[in-house]
Amino acid sequence: MNPAHLLILSAVCVSLLGAANVPPQHLNLYQFKNMIVCAGTRPWIGYVNYGCYCGAGGSGTPVDELDRCCYVHDNCYGEAEKIPGCNPKTKTYSYTCTKPNLTCTDAAGTCARIVCDCDRTAAICFAAAPYNINNFMISSSTHCQ
């Protein structure tokens, strides 16, 4: 093997070994998904690209009641982000599920409790709102201005 290639391969291996020691960020999205499943009867995946606000980002006016649930959830996360050190997308929390009831169990006023309450409220809202298949995967450039 060419010595230059061997040197590059060694550097890549060392970098990968170093990266293996970095703990992964725990995303609360898994917990949010489980809350959605607990509170409702629809598959959680149907909310990923729904309307203008369900999924990453959001703009314009929510297209319906379900999309408004996502809009409110986005704003709730925005409020949580105002707490120093609180990242709602990575903050894990404690809760119980006795289908369809959800209970957040972290101490009131903590980042974890606030994020849990955001997710709980959204999951309950999703379960109550009608689902319009025509608003799944809509064009944001056309419908969300």
Swiss-Prot record:
<feature type="disulfide bond">
    <location>
        <begin position="38"/>
        <end position="97"/>
    </location>
</feature>
<feature type="binding site">
    <location>
        <position position="57"/>
    </location>
    <ligand>
        <name>Ca(2+)</name>
    </ligand>
</feature>
<keyword id="KW-0732">Signal</keyword>
<dbReference type="GO" id="GO:0005509">
    <property type="term" value="F:calcium ion binding"/>
</dbReference>
<feature type="active site">
    <location>
        <position position="119"/>
    </location>
</feature>
<feature type="active site">
    <location>
        <position position="73"/>
    </location>
</feature>
<dbReference type="InterPro" id="IPR001211">
    <property type="entry name" value="PLipase_A2"/>
</dbReference>
<comment type="similarity">
    <text>Belongs to the phospholipase A2 family. Group I subfamily. D49 sub-subfamily.</text>
</comment>
<dbReference type="InterPro" id="IPR033113">
    <property type="entry name" value="PLipase_A2_His_AS"/>
</dbReference>
<feature type="propeptide">
    <location>
        <begin position="20"/>
        <end position="27"/>
    </location>
</feature>
<dbReference type="GO" id="GO:0005543">
    <property type="term" value="F:phospholipid binding"/>
</dbReference>
<feature type="binding site">
    <location>
        <position position="74"/>
    </location>
    <ligand>
        <name>Ca(2+)</name>
    </ligand>
</feature>
<keyword id="KW-0964">Secreted</keyword>
<dbReference type="GO" id="GO:0047498">
    <property type="term" value="F:calcium-dependent phospholipase A2 activity"/>
</dbReference>
<dbReference type="InterPro" id="IPR016090">
    <property type="entry name" value="PLipase_A2_dom"/>
</dbReference>
<dbReference type="GO" id="GO:0050482">
    <property type="term" value="P:arachidonate secretion"/>
</dbReference>
<dbReference type="InterPro" id="IPR033112">
    <property type="entry name" value="PLipase_A2_Asp_AS"/>
</dbReference>
<keyword id="KW-0378">Hydrolase</keyword>
<feature type="disulfide bond">
    <location>
        <begin position="52"/>
        <end position="144"/>
    </location>
</feature>
<keyword id="KW-0106">Calcium</keyword>
<feature type="disulfide bond">
    <location>
        <begin position="86"/>
        <end position="111"/>
    </location>
</feature>
<dbReference type="GO" id="GO:0016042">
    <property type="term" value="P:lipid catabolic process"/>
</dbReference>
<dbReference type="Pfam" id="PF00068">
    <property type="entry name" value="Phospholip_A2_1"/>
</dbReference>
<feature type="disulfide bond">
    <location>
        <begin position="54"/>
        <end position="70"/>
    </location>
</feature>
<feature type="disulfide bond">
    <location>
        <begin position="69"/>
        <end position="125"/>
    </location>
</feature>
<protein>
    <recommendedName>
        <fullName>Acidic phospholipase A2</fullName>
        <ecNumber>3.1.1.4</ecNumber>
    </recommendedName>
</protein>
<feature type="binding site">
    <location>
        <position position="53"/>
    </location>
    <ligand>
        <name>Ca(2+)</name>
    </ligand>
</feature>
<comment type="function">
    <text>PLA2 catalyzes the calcium-dependent hydrolysis of the 2-acyl groups in 3-sn-phosphoglycerides.</text>
</comment>
<feature type="disulfide bond">
    <location>
        <begin position="104"/>
        <end position="116"/>
    </location>
</feature>
<dbReference type="GO" id="GO:0005576">
    <property type="term" value="C:extracellular region"/>
</dbReference>
<feature type="binding site">
    <location>
        <position position="55"/>
    </location>
    <ligand>
        <name>Ca(2+)</name>
    </ligand>
</feature>
<keyword id="KW-0443">Lipid metabolism</keyword>
<dbReference type="InterPro" id="IPR036444">
    <property type="entry name" value="PLipase_A2_dom_sf"/>
</dbReference>
<feature type="disulfide bond">
    <location>
        <begin position="76"/>
        <end position="118"/>
    </location>
</feature>
<keyword id="KW-0442">Lipid degradation</keyword>
<dbReference type="GO" id="GO:0006644">
    <property type="term" value="P:phospholipid metabolic process"/>
</dbReference>
<keyword id="KW-1015">Disulfide bond</keyword>
<keyword id="KW-0479">Metal-binding</keyword>
<feature type="signal peptide">
    <location>
        <begin position="1"/>
        <end position="19"/>
    </location>
</feature>
